[in-house]
């Protein structure tokens, strides 16, 4: 349970300047000025965020590729990958209050929804894909006598992921869970207005035992970081949740670069709008945060 005392103890914590997470190390370098993180709750400056560029993306992708090729994760025994992902889910659950409150301060999600739909859902997703690790089977194809045809499933390589601002932990886990369970390395870009909780969740992955370089976070703007990722010649798959126009851009860049595979979830907004003349404001608030 998330009680008011816990919320109050976390909501005023200072937030250190946030940077990329590359090769297991935080890095606040960027293209120039840092992005100011403004809390939507009261408009105050919360912290700063590293503004990545093409060079930062190239470094993160190179680190991810090297980690994939060295095999510490991609060739790890499936049962061992499973154990790491379960430990990660445990840490997400254990730090749920911190993650939820950090997310609220960063992107303004209502606290009840943030607690249920963010760390809770993310941990459940990671547990689901942890169980997938040792349950991926190949096939024996039907062939004529004297011929043996086998289908062997292997990780694809480096996965690039771009997620939006609204549910960074939940949507982040949707991207990270399957990619990591199958042995891939990942470079992920969170929304520049909602990066803090995702960064913290990825730090917890390293605490759980994920080898350095397997999971890398590059913060910054879509027009620079996202563009560089979708044009990278060394990212094998791009996954994206966001707008239709940006999805089209990613597909175009994928075709113009290395014909990388793309998996897109496009469009959709579900805002809660309460008008000034609402007859029962308290009921509207209770409905918005799931209490009725």
What are these model-predicted stretches?
Residues 126, 198-201, 229, 250:
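Hydrophobic packing residues within well-ordered alpha-helices of enzyme cores
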Residues 1-49, 83, 87, 138-162, ...:
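Terminal low-complexity tails and localization/encapsulation signals of metabolic enzymes
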Residues 138-212:
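Conserved small-residue-rich beta-alpha loop and adjacent elements
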